[in-house]
Structures are given as C-alpha cells and as structure tokens.
Design a protein with these regions (language model features):
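ATPase nucleotide-binding head domains, primarily ABC-like/P-loop NTPase cores
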Residues: 35-38, 233, 303-304, 311-314, ...
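Intracellular alpha-helical coupling/juxtamembrane segments of multi-pass membrane proteins
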Residues: 325-328, 348, 352, 450, ...
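Extended active-site and interfacial segments that coordinate phosphate-rich ligands
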Residues: 38-55, 146-174, 490-521, 601-611, ...
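Charged catalytic and DNA/RNA-contacting regions of genome-maintenance
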Residues: 1-334, 350, 354-363, 367-459, ...
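Conserved catalytic alpha/beta cores of large enzymes that bind or transform nucleotide phosphates
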Residues: 171, 176-183, 190, 512-545, ...
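Amphipathic heptad-repeat alpha-helical coiled-coil/stalk segments that mediate oligomerization
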Residues: 208-220, 270-274, 286, 377-456, ...
Length: 864
C-alpha cells in the first residue's frame, strides 16, 4: 500500500469496507468510480469508461478504469443502479477542500439499497417501499418491516406448525424491496422461491443475538416497546432487531423519524394468501400486472400520496373486529351523507405534498430548499381541513380533528426564512428571504451593488480631498486602487499608501478601500455559506418536530382514505352493509365492483347471495363457460372484503358475518420453476386451503379436478366439497363452481348444500348468457355452443355434435370412427363451413364496395 498515491490509498481503504456496493467517491463536483465498480457503472449507466494512469497504483495490474457522474445529478443514476439490484455506497468529502491540510477527509455517509431509497425518482408515490426482516426457527417465526421513506414500522409473530406458512403470506403482503433473513429463513425453499422468483427482492443474510436485538429496539422505540413482544416467541424480536441493525449500518445516521412501532397480532386482520391476493386482483391485474382493472383502481380516489398508501394498506389488511369495522364505516357514512363537507375536504386535500417522505429527507439531511417549501405548502393547507372537520361532533372524524395539529408555527418559520421559489440546489444561494437576516442582506447588497459602492467611495474621496481627477480602478495585480494625476499628488492625504508610480500619476490604496474590496470579492462565498448555515439550522429545527408533523400526516392520510371510500360509494351507488358475527352472508343485488367499472356501457346484471351457517353453507354453481360463474364468485369475495375494510359495497343491501380468511382456487397454470404440473399446482393449493381454513372462512373453488381424468377429477371434486361443507369436518362457507353435473345430487345427500346455475337462453343453435344466478343445477353445459361463439370451424362443431349424441345415447360407448369417405367429404365441407363462419362474423354493412369485392374474391378462392 506504500506505493499508492494518498488518494488511491484512501479510496481502496474505503472500498475494502464496502465490497458489496458500488462506491461513489466524491472528487470535487463529481462522484468517481474506479476498477470493477467503474466497469459495472459504465455498462449499466451507459457512461464513458476512461482510465487513470498506473503511476504508483501497483494494486491494479494495468491502467485503472474509471468513470464519473456530476454530484448534483446523482439521484437519477443511483435510482437506475438500485432498480437493477445494486447497492450504492456514497462517499463524501467531510471537510472543505479549500481549508483542508493535505488529503481531503472522506467517509461513507450512506449506503443506498433497494429497501432504503429516499429520492422520489426511485419511489412509487402511492406505494410503500419496505425493507423487511424474517426470522424462522422451528415452529416460531417473526416478521418486521420498515419503510424508511415514511418511518412506518411493523412487526408480528407466528407460532405453531404453520408458522412458516403465515410468515410466507406476510412477506407476500408487504412485498418488500429488500429482506433480511437469518440462516434458517434463507434456506427455506418456499421463502426463497417467493423472494427471488416472484417478488424479486434483494436478500441479505444476517444473524443477531438476543441482547443486541433488545438493545436496538429499546434504543429506537424505548424500553416500553419490548413489552409488546410475546415472552414465548423470540423470533419477532430478533427479526426487528436484525432489521434495525441493518438500517443503522446502511444509513449511518440518526433514524429518529422511525419512532412508532406497530406490533400487531395474528387475528387482528384477515390473512390473505398469495393465491387469494392474485386471483381477487386486489392491487394489480392477473395478466398485465397493472393497477387499472384491480379493486384498488376502483377504490383509489385519494388526493394525496399518503392517503393512497394508507388505502392500499387497508385493502391488504381487512379488519376482523366488528367494532373496528363499524368505527371506520361510521366515518364513511357521515362523509357520504354530508356532500358539501366531503367535496370541500376533497378540494382542501388536493395538492398536499407527501409530508411523510418530505420529513424523512429532512431528517436525513438530504432535503433541499424546494422540499422544505413543499412542506410549508402542505402545512398551510391543514387549518382549512381542521375547520371543516369541526362539523363532526363525535366519532373517529372528531378524533382526527383533535389529532390534526395545524403546525402554524412551523409553516410561519419556513415562510419567514425561505424564498417562495428557491433554486434547485441550496449551494446556489439566493434562497433565504430578504429581510430575514441582516448580514445576508448586507452581503447581498455588496454582491449586487459592488460597482455602485466603488462609485460612491470615489465621489466621497473626490469631495474629501478636492482632487477632481481622482478615480478608483481595478487590475488583477493590485486589485482596487485610487489613481491621482501628477498635478494633484501634493493634495493626497497621509492615509493614502502609494502602490505604483505611473508616467502621468500615482496609484494608492487605503485601508477603507481594501476593506470594501475584501467585502466585494468574498461576498459571494460568504453569503452562500451563511445562507447554507441558516438553511441547515431550519432543517435541523424541522427534524426536531418530526413526531408532530408525522402525526398530522397520518391524520391527513386517514381522512383522505375515508373521503375516497365515501366518494366511490356515492358515485357507484354502494350501500352500507351490516357487519356482525352471525356467520351469515346475505347480499341483495350484489355487483362486481371492477367489472361494472371496466364496462360502463354494458348493463351489469346484479345477483343475490345467501349463505348461512346451516342453510346454504355451500353452493354448487353450474353452467357454461363464459356465463359468469367465476365473476359471480369473485364478486361475493370482494363484497365481503370491502365490508371488512369499512367500505360501502356494490349491492342494494347486505348483511355480512365476519370472515376470518378468504381462499381462492381459480384458474390453472403450470409452475415450471417448481417442477409442478397444472394438476399438481391445483392439488397443492387445495391441500393448503383444506389445512388452513376454518368454519369462519370463505372458500372460492373453481373447477376442482379438471386437470386429470374425468372420474378421478369428479371423485376428488366430490370429496373436497363434502369435506368443506360438512360441519363435522370443516363447515366453511363454500362457493363451488363445476362442470361435473353429477355433483348436483349432493344437494339431497348433504345438508347445507344448494345448487345454483347461471341462466342461459337458447335460441336455435345460439345461446344468450343472462348472467343471472338461479336455484337448481344446469341441465347441460352448452360447450359446443360456446365453441361456436369462439369461432371453431362448422365442420368441427358438426362432428362434436355427432360425438355428443353418441356419448349421450350409448352411455359411454366410444363413438364410431369416421369413415374414409366421410373424411373426404368433410375436407370439402370444411372449406364451405369456414366460408359460412367468416360470412357470419363479417359486418357487411360497414364494408366499402371495394372491401366487399375483395372479400368475395377471397372466399371464392377458398372454396376452389
């Protein structure tokens, strides 16, 4: 190391401590990268790769690769690296290079990871960005998650043989960007597949002991927080301790905005497994992974990013307490009934900045002048909101009114200190308001009026000395000087100090002139430094008020979410459901909340639902494909879920007993990554449901057994339904869609089972789906008619009819083979049927004469 230059030695020492990160090494106005980091950054960021001569750098085998980026535009580059899964260690100059003696001191100020980003370019406004931790040990599991961009921190515990399954569901619900795992959790196959393949989150494997974990938690949240953790389960304490230790290690600073811990217990919220979240399309669609088309898309009419995040969390954590559900629904109902206040609140909430994330940047010291001014703009909107809330005399809305601190003092402090439109960088100056600080005003006067000040001094000196030809000038050698011609040099005062003799005169300086010169030449640096000092004082003061500001931000988020639910209820014609512990699901004229919004021009057919603890506990639903069986079942599940987040529901009326869990088995697909076939995936999911469900669960089962032979599939479907419906075994409320019509006889053999079908009207060879759920089993599946709607050739349709008749008449005797002659005929008739099918599909009235002629020619060619 002795042969290295001091700067490269410093670089390598810092890099050695951050081997797993790309090191952004501050050199002047740039962040430079060297060696392998430079190669990686050049490739990932499309940067030009240059080299640094070897000189004394014998630690490198050849010229040192290097590349760099301007420090003031680093956020975008960091965001791109983080999105690609890298970590970035930011190494700053920790002293002023102008005053440094020798090598400038540098140190890591922060390590940016996927779970710890703070800048807006890397964050989705309406979605939390969690860094999580999971701890697994035999039959105990702990989970913790923190969004450092808002300060929200959660933790929970699971015990028993299914602890690992519950942990898996919790990780899926939070969908963290990064997760810290102990060795046992890291080796868990299901957890590895979820985090690596499905969530694509960054994994860190770390261990921590009990005393260190307790110290981290007590230091962050206080000793009292330790009492929340169960005495018989150490896993959540170790998970949270591991997470906090990692956050302190990467953030290198105070995390005092993370001051509130939400420790929740199993049973507070409805647990939804990965399959249910996916199949019900709560936050994104199955196919496109888009928000549009999801339940969140329908519900999210929030005006703030804080409200959007809270509403999303409500949707992902339905409540189980009737009291808590009613408490939230009461707020929604009051807002529904008070149109004027609701609309005024929506207007007042509009444009409020993301107070939570602004405060995180302020606490970390990364906030600029524009961030602080954005906070001020948000704070100034709080008083009108508080005034509007005073119309609610009681309940949670009144509590929000009391909680909402208008923070007038902080808004006033910011307004007095900062300009309304500060520059992008606080290093540019000109962001402290005129009149706030006398010295700033004086230095600005000097900076902007330097020429005027010199002209004023020149006039004063002329008057004082009586020298008419006296003038003040400037050159790079002497700076400012007073020049007097030879004819007046005898009148020069003793206070003038001669600096230069000219042919026609003399040049002098005075102490007063040198003082003014110093002010003018250093004013820019001095005012910039003073403004930055005043700004950091303000930022520190605001950081000290983080608890007050975050409390008001939380109140705004909750109010915004409630207003959103109320707005949706009014615009979509929802009703308030009665939620109780009766175990009954009774829905009149229920509608699918998403389907009716995706197809606003089509008339949505509402349907009734009744499922009691005894009568109608299980419903067998038969009918053709495309008729709406899956839509109806999802509709029931979504109405239940909406009710349990405190929302109104798309129905004329509803009475809903609280459901502890919703399970879904819908659709079929291979899981190639796990080496499982479609049928194996289906059976695994059914097995998980039967083991985890209780009598208070709602089961949505679609086409169980279709992935194997007919008799095997029918046997499995019947056995599963018997198990679900039998109160001596499971007795859960079950919606069971099937094409096995033989199962409909279970209505007579198993109490609590009822048959329903989707009404269909046949018109000749055509069918019309009425979308209405009616009692009784379907008498046929209309599969051939659906095939015709899908556009299968008429020759295939005709052959299918023949086979069906033979199967129905001979009770399973194999259909007679098609004769060779028939084959030959069918080949020609197939062309004819394709032509007929094409003609049926064409909208002839919309064709131009030329298009019609081309179509005719094409069809004739096909027949020939």
């Amino acid at each position: 190391m002795a042969e290295l230059t001091p700067m490269m030695k410093q670089y390598l020492e810092i890099k050695e401590q951050n081997k797993d990160s790309i090191l952004f090494f501050r050199l002047g106005d740039f962040y430079e990268m060297f060696g392998s980091d430079a190669r990686t950054a050049s490739r990932e960021l499309d940067l030009t790769l240059t080299t640094r001569d070897k000189d004394k750098n014998k630690s490198f085998d050849e010229k040192v690769p290097m590349c760099g980026i301007p420090y003031h535009s680093s956020e975008g580059y960091i965001a791109r690296l983080i999105a690609k899964g890298y970590k970035v260690a930011i190494c700053e100059q920790t002293e002023d290079p102008a005053t440094a003696k020798g090598l400038v001191k540098r140190d890591i100020i922060r390590v940016v990871t996927p779970g710890t980003v703070l800048d807006d370019t890397s964050l989705e406004a309406g979605r939390s960005n969690f860094c999580a931790a999971a701890w697994l040990a035999e039959d105990k599991a702990g989970f913790a998650a923190c969004d450092i961009s808002t300060g929200q921190t959660h933790a929970t515990a699971f015990s028993g043989p299914d602890a690992g399954v519950h942990l898996l569901n919790e990780v899926a619900r939070f969908s963290p960007a990064e997760i810290i795992l102990n060795d046992t959790a890291a080796q868990d196959a299901a957890l590895r597949m979820l985090t690596e393949n499905k969530l694509s989150c960054h994994r860190e494997i770390r261990e921590i002991d009990g005393p260190a974990a307790r110290a981290s938690i007590a230091g962050q949240f206080g000793e009292k927080a330790l009492s929340d953790f169960p005495a018989d389960n150490f896993a959540p304490l170790l998970a949270l301790g591991n997470l906090l230790h990692y956050l302190h290690e990467t953030q290198k600073g105070d995390l005092h905005h993370i001051d509130t811990l939400d420790f929740y217990r199993q049973g507070q919220f409805m647990e939804l497994d990965i399959s249910a979240r996916r199949n019900l399309e709560l936050t994104e669609t199955l196919r496109g992974k888009e928000k549009k088309g999801s339940l969140l898309w329908v519900l999210d009419k929030t005006k703030t990013a804080m409200g959007a995040r809270m509403l999303r969390s409500w949707l992902e954590r339905p409540l189980l307490s009737v009291r808590d559900i009613d408490r939230r629904a009461d707020c929604v109902e009051r807002l529904v009934n008070d149109t004027v206040t609701r609309e005024e609140l929506a207007l007042a909430l509009s444009g409020i900045g993301d107070m939570e994330r602004l405060m995180s940047r302020i606490v970390y010291g990364s906030a600029g002048g524009r961030d602080v001014v954005a906070l001020r703009a948000a704070l100034e909107k709080l008083p009108p909101i508080k005034r509007l809330l005073t119309v609610f005399p009681k309940g949670r809305l009144q509590e929000l009114c009391r909680t909402l601190d208008t923070l007038d003092d902080l808004a006033g402090r910011i307004a007095a200190t900062l300009q309304d439109e500060p520059p992008f960088s606080v290093r540019e100056g000109e962001f402290i308001r005129d009149g706030f600080h006398p010295e700033v005003d004086r230095l600005r006067g000097i900076l902007h009026g330097g020429k005027g000040l010199m002209a004023s001094m020149e006039a004063q000196e002329k008057e004082k000395t009586g020298i008419r030809t006296l003038k003040i000038g400037y050159n790079k050698v002497f700076g400012y000087y007073i020049e007097v011609s030879n004819s007046f040099k005898d009148q020069v005062p003793d206070t003038y100090i001669r600096k230069q003799t000219l042919v026609n005169g003399e040049r002098y300086i005075t102490q007063e002139l040198k003082n003014l010169e110093s002010d003018i030449l250093t004013a820019a640096d001095r005012v910039s430094a003073l403004e930055y000092e005043l700004f950091t004082d303000l930022r520190t003061e605001l950081a000290g008020q983080v608890s007050r500001i975050q409390a008001s931000a939380s109140a705004v988020a909750e109010l915004d979410s409630l207003c959103s639910l109320a707005s949706v209820a009014v615009s979509n014609g929802y009703c308030r459901p009665t939620v109780d512990d009766s175990g009954v699901l009774e829905i009149h004229d229920g509608r699918h909340p998403v389907v009716e919004k995706m197809r606003p021009d089509a008339l949505f057919v509402p349907n009734d639902t009744y499922m009691g603890e005894k009568e109608g506990r299980a419903a067998i639903i038969t009918g053709p494909n495309m008729a709406g069986k899956s839509t109806y079942m999802r509709q029931v599940a979504l109405i239940v879920l909406l009710a349990q987040i405190g929302s109104f529901v798309p129905a004329k009326s509803a009475r809903l007993g609280v459901v502890d869990r919703i399970f879904t088995r819908i659709g079929a697909s291979d899981d190639l990554s796990a080496g499982q076939s479609t049928f194996m995936v289906e059976m695994t999911e059914v097995s998980d449901i039967l083991h985890a469900a209780t009598k208070d669960s709602l089961l949505i089962l679609d086409e169980i057994g279709r992935g194997t032979s007919t008799f095997d599939g029918m046997s499995i479907a019947r056995a599963v339904l018997e198990y679900c419906a039998d109160p001596k075994k499971l007795g859960a409320k079950t919606l069971f869609a099937t094409h096995y019509h033989e199962l409909t006889d279970m209505e007579h053999s198993l109490p609590g089972v009822q048959n329903y079908n989707i009404a269909v009207r046949a018109r000749g060879e055509e069918i019309i789906f009425l979308r209405k759920i009616v009692p009784g089993g379907a008498d046929r599946s209309y599969g051939i008619e659906v095939a015709r709607l899908a556009g299968l050739p008429e020759g295939v349709i005709a052959r299918a009819k023949t086979i069906l008749r033979e199967l129905e008449s001979e009770a399973g005797k194999p259909p007679a083979p098609i004769q060779e002659e028939a084959d030959q005929v069918s080949l020609s008739s197939l062309a004819e049927t394709e032509v007929l099918s094409r003609l049926r599909r064409e909208q002839v009235d919309t064709l131009s004469p030329l298009e019609a002629l081309n179509l005719l020619y094409e069809l004739k060619q096909k027949l020939q």
